[in-house]
Amino acid sequence: MKKLIVFALSLTFLFLTCCGEIPVTETTTQEETTEPEIETTTEAWEIDRTGEEIYQAHPDLTPVDYTSPMILPLSEDMGQEYVDKLTFICDSPTYWMWPWGLLGGGEDTNSIWTGPEGTMTLAYQSSYCILDPFDNIEKPIRQVVEEHKPEYLILAVGINGVSFMDEEEFKADYEDLVSDILEISPETKLMCQSIYPITPAYRWWGDITNVMITEANSWILDVAEEYGVPYLDTFSVLLAEDGHAKRELMGSDGLHPNYEGLKTVLQYIRTHKYREVTKAVG
């Protein structure tokens, strides 16, 4: 009897379905999809601690804060092609890259921006005119930046302010220059470079010492952290174990790196390539 009832119900259901009384729900089989694997790579950044042992041996020097995320780490050698893209706003220790033909264009380079006498002073940066190498006309720094908007710009100034500027004055002028460059040319990849060490052969040794320079370099790093600008520790690459500049890399005046010294600086820069860094919070 039960089988007959089930059979009758089945016939009824079939009849109603064929007549359209009961809707038929169409089912589809969803194909299983898998998300494509995204290859992620984490680049290991190795901080170059070149001068660490020297700072430990000379506690009077202000050591580099190697924990700072602004310090550019070791990278692959970017080669002369990278160097040829660099522009420097600089004072006299870096100026000599120009006459020695170390940058793009050789002795005809347009990559050294400084005063007509081959130097400039940080304290006067707001009003000082540098020589625009593209037309040999003296112009305010900011005007030259606005007109040419370089791809890479390295700020290599400060030695001419170390002897008479305190921390507040030094930072104020350095910040003013950095913030204006970032505003005028936001696509420019700006880097801050440390002041080079000197030797006691410098005739004004005492008015300027490496103790003072390392302190000023810590101020530069502070500004770099505030504005999220990468920092090049070019001081340490020229530093000898005695806490002064390596004499074989310096000119006889004790202030300016010689040809090999500036080649050493550029080798450091091209093996510590620009990368974006995270601005300090607070």
Where are these regions (language model features)?
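N-terminal secretory targeting modules
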Residues: 2-89, 93-99, 276-282
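Extracellular glycan-modifying ectodomains
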Residues: 21-23, 78-81, 139-143, 160-162, ...
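Conserved SGNH/GDSL esterase-like catalytic core that processes O-acyl groups on lipids
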Residues: 76-172
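A structural signal for isolated positions on well-ordered beta-strands in alpha/beta enzyme cores
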Residues: 87, 154, 189-191, 230
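Sec-exported extracytoplasmic/periplasmic mature domains
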Residues: 98, 146-149, 158, 175, ...
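Active-site segments of SGNH/GDSL-like serine hydrolases
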Residues: 156, 160, 182-214
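Charged helix-capping and loop-helix junction motifs
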Residues: 167-177, 213-216
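Catalytic His-Asp segment of secreted/periplasmic serine-dependent ester chemistry enzymes
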Residues: 197-282
